[in-house]
Amino acid sequence: MKLLAPVLWAMAALGVTWLVAVDSKESCTKHSNGCSTPLRLPCQEYFRPACDIHDNCYHCGTIFGISRKECDDAFLKDMNTLCKKLGSNSATCPARGKREVTSHRATSIAHSRLWKTALDQKSFLNRKARQAILLTPNSCLYWANNFYMAVHVFGARSYSRTTDPKDCQGLKHCLPNH
């Protein structure tokens, strides 16, 4: 019986820690609509963590002194970081279903000319050759730039200048580090 009490206390402490972590994560989606677009786009789900931070930044940025430009720049940086996490697979976003996997294979074959062009360069490390490969229409970096341009051009109406400070209490950890 004496051994049971410490185990129960430890389980309770771990449970509370887990609940706080879940609550903290959930609070970061309070003002987020994900990567909302009228169409389903590649990388949309993969970029969701960056979109959540960006949505919170648009909602609470003025409260914490973060400009719209800083929100957008942090958004691009966060998406590029996600792309870099893919490592050597950064040429494409992770596929979500069989249809996307199949279309990805077909697209890879269709874009094989880009690889040939890059390999024909004097050096594979040639900057233009690398850019041609990384910014193909299915690349993670290509879509990161597209998402960034969309919010940069069309996001002005969504950036809130009249947010109630109470709405943003406890959300500073959900904003970009600027």
From Swiss-Prot:
Annotated localization: Secreted
GO biological process: arachidonate secretion; phospholipid metabolic process
Enzyme class: hydrolase
Modification 4-hydroxyproline, positions: P38, P42, P49, P137
An example Gene Ontology CC term for this record: extracellular region
Cited InterPro entries: PLA2_conodipine-like, PLipase_A2_dom_sf
Keyword Disulfide bond applies: yes
One Gene Ontology molecular-function label: phospholipase A2 activity
Superkingdom classification of source: Eukaryota
Propeptide: 98-130
Cofactor: Ca(2+)
Signal peptide: 1-24
UniProt-listed Enzyme Commission number(s): 3.1.1.4
Residues found modified as Pyrrolidone carboxylic acid: Q131
Catalytic activity as recorded in UniProt: a 1,2-diacyl-sn-glycero-3-phosphocholine + H2O = a 1-acyl-sn-glycero-3-phosphocholine + a fatty acid + H(+)
Keyword annotations from UniProtKB, A to Z: Calcium, Disulfide bond, Hydrolase, Hydroxylation, Pyrrolidone carboxylic acid, Secreted, Signal, Toxin
UniProt note on tissues of expression: Expressed by the venom duct.
Assembly mode: Heterodimer of an alpha and a beta chain; probably disulfide-linked.
Annotated function: Catalyzes the calcium-dependent hydrolysis of the 2-acyl groups in 3-sn-phosphoglycerides.
Protein family according to the UniProt entry: Belongs to the phospholipase A2 family. Group IX subfamily.
Name listed for the protein in its UniProt record: Conodipine-P1
Species this protein is from: Conus purpurascens (Purple cone)
